[in-house]
Amino acid sequence: DAIAQLLNEGKVQLFCADSIDAESLLAGDTAPRRRAEMQEKYFNYLTSELAPRILTLNGAKKDTLLWAVGVDTGAYQAVNCRLRRPEVFAGAIGLSGLYDVSRFLGNAADDLVLRNAPLAYLAEEGLVDKKLLAKAEENALLLCAGQGSYEGDALVDTQAMADALTDCGLPVHLEV
C-alpha cells in the first residue's frame, strides 16, 4: 500500500530477479572459489543483462533511475551492485543484509572474491570509484535492520557496512 499510488501512476515499477544463492553464496558443498565464480556470473547477469533489459522493456528515457533492493543476501546483492556499478544503479536499499560474505566465500584471498566482498573492497584503494559514488544523491544507500533475536548477523553486518561506507566518505542512511 505504501507505494500503491506510485505504481498505479506508472511512476515506479518493481522487478524481481531470481536468486542463484543455492549455486553461489549458499552452496556449502562447493569450493569457495567456485562460489565466487558463480557470484560474479550473477553480478554480471544483474548489471549487464537484466538492468539493460528492464530499461529496454520500458523504452526508458535517459534519466530513468534504477534502484536495487534486497533482503538478507539480496541486500548484499543490491548494495554490491550499487557500489560496483553506480552508473547502472542510482541507489540501493539493503534490508537486514548479510554483507560479510567471508562466511560464504572465505577470506578475500584473490581478486574475484575481493570484488564480491564489499566490506573488504571498500577498505582497498582503487577498487571502488569513490568519487563517482560520492557525487551520488544523498542517501542513495539505505541500510535497515531490525533488532529481533533472529537479526543478530544482519544487525552486526548492517552496522559494519554503514561504518565502512562512512569511513570511505560515502553517504549512507542507517535505520536500526
Where are these regions (language model features)?
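Non-catalytic cap/lid and distal C-terminal segments of serine-dependent acyl enzymes
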Residues: D1-V176
